[in-house]
Amino acid sequence: MICTKMKAACLLLLGAYTILITGCSTDQRIAKKVGKEFKNSQAIKQYQVGFALYNMDDKKMIYQKDADKYFTPASNTKLYTFYASLKMLPERMPALKYIEKNDSLIFWGTGDPAFLQFAVKDQSAYNFLLSSNKKLFFAPGRYSGTFFGDGWAWDDYDYYYQPEISEMPIMDNMVTSTYVNPNKINIVPKVFAPCFSVDSTKTTGNFQVTRDFLTNKFHHPAVAVKPGYNQQNPYKTSPQTTIEVLGDTLHKPVGLIDLKIPANAKTLYGAKRDSVLKHMMLPSDNFIAEHLLLVCSNQLGDTLSTTKAIQYINKHYLSFLPDKVKWVDGSGLSRQNLFTPRDMVYLLDSIYKQVNDPVKLFDMMPAGGKSGTLKNAYPKTDNPFVYGKTGSLGGVHNQSGFVLTKKGKTYIYSFMNNGFVKPTAEVRAEMVRVITYIHDNF
């Protein structure tokens, strides 16, 4: 009997040892082959590249190339904002803080990006204010930052991807102009229509709207509008602009009041958090990303501060990262952000565990060949094998996410490229080649 038990125990140990050795040898084989792909790539030798590949089953790195070096992440930063939002925000986003006092409804912004946002289309705050029979007053002053994040390119103030940051954003903080006929455009919000004027000195070229840097004066050339024309320009934010846009949208007057938010202020909840996160991730929406950090800050106290939110998140939720991050904004527009590829991998692993539902998580992320910013990066398919986040600035192009292999494995990867002068398409193609190789072979 004793011999039989000893024999069984030995067989179990031998089996476990065999599995361990097999697992190690498999990872070593993958590391060797992936390393060879990097070594033999002439393209990758021309710029700074960091890469990390992580085995989720064994909870260990398979292959690293300068994975402990710092890179400008661009919109890979949104993965940090995504994780922070999962940790700090309730399932329904705080849309407004308010009190009712005598004949007045006084409200404060929470930074909520969903107020009539063109993709989320949440109307919770709108309907709440519209249905009130009290006088409406907006109380500004919660936001402690500037209208642009640290390290942003101010030259980009007039581009759709860089709306201003404010405590109560409305309609993406942008003006949308669209084609009506060759001589007319439709302007939303309509309150900005009187701010548009024709620049009679420009009589050639395409119809394009521009805005003055410090004011809400919009100009367009004296040329015909072409069918299909659709443009978004950020508007210049201010408390006065906020109440004018609100009043025009609600078709009722909204006043300003100087009042600090009291402890007994109530919270109105609005859009579903996960819906907002998906609308941030798929198109890489900078506006949503920045304001999500303000909503996180709203959970901490009276002041809306990107810096305060990031400091809190770093202290309470990111201590597991192997490298200290330099994180300054929610979107990645700033070149001051610096993350390592291995940090990106461990963050994605924590996101995976936090959501605890791969189908749900992957639905919120761009999918290679199918959706979001990865739709055109990989061949068109209904069965994507890559789910992740891209990040691009001049000389910067990154991908971090999950790769599903033909052998049924799911690996986490981060592929960061900085300091290149060649076309971004060539850098992207090399990333796609390597990630596809991993999918096909492992």
List each language-model region with its residue ranges:
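C-terminal motif of bacterial Sec signal peptides marking the signal peptidase cleavage site
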Residues: 21-23
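Beta-lactamase-like hydrolase cores
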Residues: 25-70, 89-92, 130-134
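Solvent-exposed, polar/charged alpha-helical surfaces in well-ordered, non-transmembrane soluble domains
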Residues: 32, 36, 80-83, 166, ...
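Residue-level preference for non-acidic, small/hydrophobic
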Residues: 59, 78-82, 168, 246, ...
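Small-residue-rich helix-loop
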Residues: 62-64, 293-442
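Active/ligand-binding-proximal structured segments within catalytic/core domains
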Residues: 71-85
